[in-house]
Amino acid sequence: MQFRRAHHLTSLLMAALLAIGASVASRADVLDGVLEVSSAYVKPEQGVFQLFARITYPVNDDIRAALKDGLMLNFDLDVVVSRERRFWMDETVAEYTLKRELLYHAVSDRYVARDVDSPNNDQRSYATLEEALEALGTVDAWPFLLSPQLSANRQYRVSLRAGVRRGRLSDTMRVLLFWTEGWHRESEWFSWSLQR
């Protein structure tokens, strides 16, 4: 009799652990979908190199629901400029990060995006998540590098990587998501030789 009770308790405990594990596994896939730098190029304009890029971010119902529940997402675009060396590792000349945020505003029923480092604290709002992610994935004429930072007669490489991660949380979301790790993802590096 005691053996049956212990076996039953062990079975219940195993079922509970499996349910928790399945829940964690399903949450880890929350940022599933395409995350890539689709295209990018640099255009020199009066001694300033401007970046043009298109990034595809994942979109799914889990992201939409989390934003509507008060989660903020951070979108980072890492840019690395390195001097190519023939017989040694490339030398990093400059590193920059374009930081953007996305949140859902419940009163207006709109998605609000902003550039974190913008001096004007500009915000733009969008009716749908798809529109907001398309805008966040569009970088047009972002000045990131000055000509004097580059030496003449040297070859340089520009590399981009897009990332999505969990931002600020409401108190309710902090309690629910404190143990999840599925809210951070980065794309592969997208690289090309800099033409001057």
Task: Go through the PLM ranges and name each one.
Residues 10-21:
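Bacterial N-terminal signal peptides
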Residues 1-6:
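N-terminal secretory signal peptides that target proteins for export/translocation
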Residues 64-129:
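Structured domain cores in non-transmembrane regions
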Residues 144-196:
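Glycine-rich, aromatic-bearing surface loops/beta-hairpins
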Residues 50-55, 106, 117-119, 127-150:
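A beta-strand/beta-hairpin structural motif
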